[in-house]
């Protein structure tokens, strides 16, 4: 991964823990790009920005809300 290219970090059952950030990157697109590999639907998805939780979703509820825009350096934690 190019250290000069901004990224979003994903922790949990994904193939790629880094997704290149670009303007307009959303939470669901980042998870799809990272390739979710879990056996179950995620129970909780949390988005951290500068160490603070800025998004906290129950996995299935994620589809019921407007897709969250991510910023460079965000960390997405997926809990099964």
Write out the residue ranges for each language-model feature.
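Ser/Thr/Pro/Gly-biased, low-complexity, turn-/loop-rich segments
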Residues: 1-80
């Amino acid at each position: 991964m190019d250290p000069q290219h901004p990224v979003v970090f994903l922790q949990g059952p994904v193939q790629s823990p880094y997704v290149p950030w670009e303007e307009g990157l959303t939470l669901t697109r980042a998870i799809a790009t990272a390739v979710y590999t879990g056996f179950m639907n995620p129970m909780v998805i949390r988005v951290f920005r500068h160490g603070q939780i800025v998004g906290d979703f129950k996995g299935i509820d994620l589809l019921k809300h407007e897709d969250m825009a991510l910023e460079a350096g965000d960390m997405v934690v997926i809990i099964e």
